Amino acid sequence: IFTVGKYEERKNLFMMINVIRQLAGQYPVKLTIAGECSNQFQKDYYSRLKQNVKEAGLENRVRLLCNLTRTEMNAEYQKADLFVLPSTREPASISQLEAMAFSVPVVCSDTNGSACYVEEGHNGRLFQDNCEESLRETVETMLRSQDQLIQMGRNAYQDVKEKYQFNNYYEGIMECLNCLKK
C-alpha cells in the first residue's frame, strides 16, 4: 500500500498506520508513506509517526520516506498494489491521478475533493471520512482479491487515459467554446 502527503495531522497517517496494525495479522500488508518533511511542524509529526511505528512493532511493515524526487516517487508508484489517501479535508489531490496513471487502484474518503475520480468498485473505493473502521473495512475489501486489485488498476489507468489527460481536457474546452460561438 502506498500513500503520499505532507507529514501533517490532516493527512490521518496515524489512522492509516493503525489500520495496517489491525490488518497485519491477516494479510501480508506493507505500507509506504512518502511525504514532504520540510518545516519544523512536519519534522515533529514525522518523528511522532516514526515512534508510533516502532511502538506498534511495525518497522518491518511501514516505511516512512521524506522529500522524494519525482523519479523516486514514480518508482514507489510502480511498486504499489493499492494507493490509499486517508486525509480529511483534502481539497483535491493530484496523487490519486498519479497512482491511477500507474495502474494502481485508489481508496480515499467520501469527502475528498478528488473523490469524483473514484468509481466505486471500478477503479477504487471510498471510505467514510475520518472513520478508522470504515477505512479498515475498505482496505480489507480491496486486499481480499488480487485479481480485483489488478482489474481495478487497469480500469484506473484507462480512466486517466480517457478522461484526465490534458489533450482530452483541451478538446472538451474547445468543444464548449465552439458551442458558445453558435
Where do the model's predicted regions map?
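Glycosyltransferase donor-sugar binding loop
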Residues: 30-50
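A short, well-ordered alpha-helix in the C-terminal region of glycosyltransferases
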Residues: 134, 141, 148-163, 169-175
